[in-house]
């Protein structure tokens, strides 16, 4: 029995979703691979696109595309990029008319959170910030064993509480939440419980200076080569 194909855009070489055609032409999916979502789910795509007809959603999407456009410029040398993400954050928040911003950060990035808060305040925003250890709840509360504590079994260690972070952000009624360096998994919970518009300034990567793509760029090197090694069945 043939294996049912799933969506695999990452392995597509055709890119029919971004064709090199004129603006008045109609994109074709004739060359789309069988795993292309434009082949597999045309009705779903049509239904989802209708969401952009909602005025608030349409305007948000429009502003996001304008922001994308403004981050590039054509020069004599060709196309070049213009702004780092922190400047984009400021520009986009201004475009949206946001005034109050909320930073949910990892305590390990306290210095970065302070710097970010100062920068945003200097740009005229009201800024609140809440760290991951808010509540000072012991890790034992979620079933962590003494030997699983980073500080050691004999010491107190507060659990990271992204749910509390999210609820504080919610009750503060910020216009935009900014996630800064939350651990993997903790970021997932924050996203699940946050009920206001949210963006990510940086994610946690303890080895690469919070730049996880560095591991991909170095995945063929001696040190990171283990990332490209295929797992044997016995390792599963």
Feature-to-residue mapping (PLM):
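An N-terminal assembly and electron-transfer interface module characteristic of large anaerobic redox
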Residues: 1-236
